A protein has these predicted regions:
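Short, cysteine-centered beta-strand-loop-beta hairpins and adjacent loop/turn segments enriched
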Residues: 29-33, 56-65
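Low-complexity, intrinsically disordered terminal/linker segments enriched in charged
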Residues: 84-119
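A solvent-exposed, acidic/Ser-Thr-rich amphipathic alpha-helical stretch
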Residues: 1-48
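Short coil/turn motifs at secondary-structure junctions
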Residues: 57-59, 74-77, 88-90
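Generic short beta-strand segments
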Residues: 4-5, 51-57
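Short hydrophobic/aromatic-rich beta-strand segments that constitute the beta-sheet cores
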Residues: 7-8, 50, 80-83
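A short, structured loop/turn motif at beta-sheet edges
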Residues: 41-47, 73-80
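Short, surface-exposed coil-to-beta transition loops
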Residues: 34-37, 51, 63-70, 83
Length: 119
C-alpha cells in the first residue's frame, strides 16, 4: 500500500503499514487536541473524495485549522491502496476555534458539519 502524505509533517511518501504507522505517530505527537470533520465530496467505483478541516495546537499553544481534500482508492479486498491528501495549515486564535467537543471521544452526532460551519 502506498500513501501520499504532505503538509505539516513534510512532503513525501509512506509505503507499507509500518511506515504509515510511524508517520501518523509523528503527526499526532505534533498536532495536539486534534479534532476533525470530513465531508463526502464525491465517489465512484472504488474511489472516494472528501474535504476536511481539523483544528489542533502545537506544544507552544499555537492553534491551527487545517483544510484540504483527500482522495482515496480502494483495492479489491476493500483496503485503502492509495491516499492522496494536501492539508493547508492556517494559524488561528484560540477564540476562533469552532470545534469544542471533548477530543478523547468521537465528534458528537449532532455537531455542525463543515457546510453548516461555513468551512
Amino acid at each position: 500500500m502506498r500513501q501520499t502524505v504532505t503538509g505539516a509533517i513534510g512532503a513525501g511518501f509512506a509505503v507499507g503499514r509500518p511506515a504509515i504507522v510511524a508517520l501518523l505517530q509523528r503527526k499526532w505527537a505534533r498536532e495536539l487536541d486534534y479534532r476533525l470533520i470530513k465531508e463526502l465530496w464525491a465517489f465512484t467505483g472504488n474511489r472516494i473524495a472528501v474535504r476536511f478541516a481539523y483544528e489542533w495546537h502545537d506544544d507552544s499553544g499555537n492553534w491551527f485549522r487545517s483544510y484540504g481534500n483527500e482522495n482515496w482508492h480502494y483495492n479489491d479486498a476493500g483496503l485503502m491502496e492509495y491516499r492522496y491528501g494536501l492539508p493547508n495549515d492556517l494559524s488561528i486564535k484560540e477564540s476562533d476555534r469552532k470545534y469544542h467537543w471533548d477530543c478523547s471521544g468521537p465528534r458528537p452526532a449532532d455537531h455542525s458539519s463543515l457546510t453548516d460551519l461555513g468551512l
